[in-house]
Each structure stands twice: as C-alpha cells, then as structure tokens.
Swiss-Prot record:
<dbReference type="GO" id="GO:0008198">
    <property type="term" value="F:ferrous iron binding"/>
</dbReference>
<dbReference type="GO" id="GO:0050498">
    <property type="term" value="F:oxidoreductase activity, acting on paired donors, with incorporation or reduction of molecular oxygen, with 2-oxoglutarate as one donor, and the other dehydrogenated"/>
</dbReference>
<dbReference type="InterPro" id="IPR015038">
    <property type="entry name" value="GlaH"/>
</dbReference>
<comment type="subunit">
    <text>Homotetramer.</text>
</comment>
<keyword id="KW-0223">Dioxygenase</keyword>
<comment type="function">
    <text>Acts as an alpha-ketoglutarate-dependent dioxygenase catalyzing hydroxylation of glutarate (GA) to L-2-hydroxyglutarate (L2HG). Functions in a L-lysine degradation pathway that proceeds via cadaverine, glutarate and L-2-hydroxyglutarate.</text>
</comment>
<protein>
    <recommendedName>
        <fullName>Glutarate 2-hydroxylase</fullName>
        <ecNumber>1.14.11.64</ecNumber>
    </recommendedName>
</protein>
<comment type="pathway">
    <text>Amino-acid degradation.</text>
</comment>
<dbReference type="GO" id="GO:0019477">
    <property type="term" value="P:L-lysine catabolic process"/>
</dbReference>
<keyword id="KW-0560">Oxidoreductase</keyword>
<dbReference type="InterPro" id="IPR042098">
    <property type="entry name" value="TauD-like_sf"/>
</dbReference>
<feature type="binding site">
    <location>
        <position position="292"/>
    </location>
    <ligand>
        <name>Fe cation</name>
    </ligand>
</feature>
<feature type="binding site">
    <location>
        <position position="162"/>
    </location>
    <ligand>
        <name>Fe cation</name>
    </ligand>
</feature>
<comment type="similarity">
    <text>Belongs to the glutarate hydroxylase family.</text>
</comment>
<feature type="binding site">
    <location>
        <position position="160"/>
    </location>
    <ligand>
        <name>Fe cation</name>
    </ligand>
</feature>
<dbReference type="Pfam" id="PF08943">
    <property type="entry name" value="CsiD"/>
</dbReference>
<keyword id="KW-0479">Metal-binding</keyword>
C-alpha cells in the first residue's frame, strides 16, 4: 500500500441482508468481494431467459440489457446498485461472482447468459475484435503456437490492463471459467494500484504521462495503432493505468528502459493476490485501478481450460481517463 490512497472501510455490512444473493469479503483481500446467487435465483433466472439462445443475445444487443433486468428484478433490484457501488469504489472495485448450480462446461451457454446479465447492469460490453462478438471464448492447452501470451500455459501471463490497444474506453473486465481439465495452478493474479508499493515512484516519473504507441499482434484483428500514456488520473486526481507489457512499443532507449523497470516493479510487488476461480465463477474488476494476469500451469498432455471474457464501459460513471480519452 502507498500513501496516495488510503483503504476505506469495507462496504460489506455484516448485518445487510440481500435478496437473491449473498455478499462476503474474499479470503484473499477485503478489496475483493464474493457474490453468490442463490440456487433459487439461479434457477428462476435460467427459466426466464430460456427463450433466448446465446445467438439471440449476439444478434439483438438490447436483449443483453433485458436479461440484466430480469436478474436484477429477481434480486429485488438490490443487485444493480450493489454492483455499481462496489466497482466504482476505489477501496474495492472487484467481485468474484458465482451462481449456485452453474459449475459444468455443459452449462456454457447458461454461463454466457449470466455473465452478460451482470455486465449489462453496470454498462455495456464492447465489440471484441478477436471473436467478432461482444464476448470472446478461448481455450488454453498444453501446447500453444499463438502470437501472444494469452494462451501460453507454462509461463506467467504478466499483470496488465485490458483495452490498451483499442480506442474504446475499457472500464471493466469480466473473466469467467467455463471449463477446466487436468489443471494444476493457473490462478488469476490481481494487483490493486493502491497496494502496489512502487506506484508513487512510477506515477510521478516524467514518462508516466508521455503518449506511447500500443500495437496488437495479428490474432487480435486490430490493425490500427493507438497512442496514450501508461498513467492517467480519474476525476479525483487518483492514478489509473492503461498498460500491457506485450503491446507497448517504446520509441527510444529512454522509454524502453523505463518500461522494463516498470514491468519488473509490477511483477515483483508484494501486493499481488493469487485467486483461484472454479468453473462457473467469474471475476469482475474495475480495469482502471486493478491489474490482472495469470499464474503458470503445471504441464499435462491433456491440459485444457476454456475462458470467456467481456470488457466494456460503465454506463453510470463520469470519471473515465481525464487527459487522454
């Protein structure tokens, strides 16, 4: 933790009763909350959205908000304000979400529907150029020949923000576990900016606000480079980041050395959380002040993990990046 932002009291009220779900602090950190939909809520939600296959959500974007409203109504309209309060709260900003009874790859479509409902209670998920949809599903196997670290199992995927190489604002990231076979390791890694002991050193550096070039590999289906600084501030002047080590392209020696030192300082932080995410659960984080990554897996010839992601913007927030939109 550093002196830039003190941790506030956790918003979880032990005496608060919610309708349709429970909420507790996680074992890893009071910043990360665990939200669990009850079995009754889960079953009623799936019954009420059964008429719409995932393809309908892909083709008719307004249905994504419709399923969100159904879920919120089942939770006595307590869910949407709770999600927004948590994700916009600098002291928290992260949720591990679970629905009782959704825990098998055979329910993959139900997982997409649930995650879509939650995401569209806080904003809208952006078009994902890698998949051509508002979400992306991808598989990690024991052998990988792709052009980024996304699917490479036997190394750490370094901490980063999403949306660094696109022009759309990326306020939130949702990462869901759809399937897992012959897996050991591979926990999600999270770092809250205010728990990074070197934040002040790098945030105050002259290069922190210099626009840098970000370019994605061919698999991302994005051909246009974007330019923005690694650091920015929110409306209250607090540090936020748009950073990924794989895609930032330093233009000279000075930038290259600084970025290398930045990467080392992030990866060696004592504030990193290691979070197991079982099948059917998903992480939902504020992408402006949480970095995320993945630990390495233990090799196995039949290793398989399938993930689903959504990333988008908050429809109810006014504090995006202040100087570089």
């Amino acid at each position: 933790m550093n002196a830039l932002t003190a941790v506030q009291n956790n918003a979880v009220d032990s005496g608060q009763d919610y309708s349709g779900f429970t909420l507790i602090p996680s074992a890893q950190s009071p910043r990360l909350l665990e939200l669990t939909f009850t079995e009754q809520t889960t079953n009623r939600f799936l019954e009420q959205v059964a008429e719409w296959p995932v393809q309908a959500l892909e083709y008719k974007s307004f249905l994504r908000f419709r399923v969100g409203k159904i879920l919120d109504d089942l939770c006595a309209n307590q869910l949407q304000p709770l999600l927004l309060k948590t994700l916009l709260n600098r002291a928290e900003g992260a949720l591990l979400i679970n629905a009782v009874g959704i825990d098998d790859v055979a329910q993959a479509d139900e997982m997409v529907k649930l995650a879509t409902a939650v995401a569209h209670l806080i904003g809208r998920s952006n078009f994902d150029a890698m998949s051509g949809q508002y979400y992306a599903r991808f598989v990690v196997k024991n052998v990988d020949n792709s052009d980024s670290y996304l699917r490479q199992p036997h190394r750490v995927m370094e901490l980063h923000n999403d949306g660094t190489y696109v022009e759309e604002i990326t306020d939130y990231v949702l990462m869901m576990k759809i399937d897992e076979q012959n897996m050991q390791g591979g926990n999600s890694l999270l770092l809250h900016l205010d728990d990074w002991e070197h934040l002040g050193l790098f945030f105050r550096h002259p290069l922190a606000r210099r626009p840098m070039r970000f370019a994605a590999p061919p698999s991302k289906n994005v051909s246009k480079d974007v330019f923005h600084p690694v650091f920015d501030v929110d409306q209250q002047g607090r540090p936020v980041m748009r950073y990924i080590d794989q895609f930032v392209q330093p233009k000279d020696f000075e930038e290259g050395v600084w970025l290398s030192e930045l990467s080392d300082a992030i990866e060696t932080s004592k504030g990193i959380l290691s979070v197991p995410v079982p099948v059917g659960k998903f992480l939902l984080i504020n992408n402006l002040f949480w970095l995320h990554g993945r630990d390495r897996f233990t090799p196995h010839p039949d290793l398989r993990r399938e993930l689903m992601r959504q990333r988008g913007y908050f429809a109810y927030a006014t504090h995006h990046y202040q100087t570089h939109q």
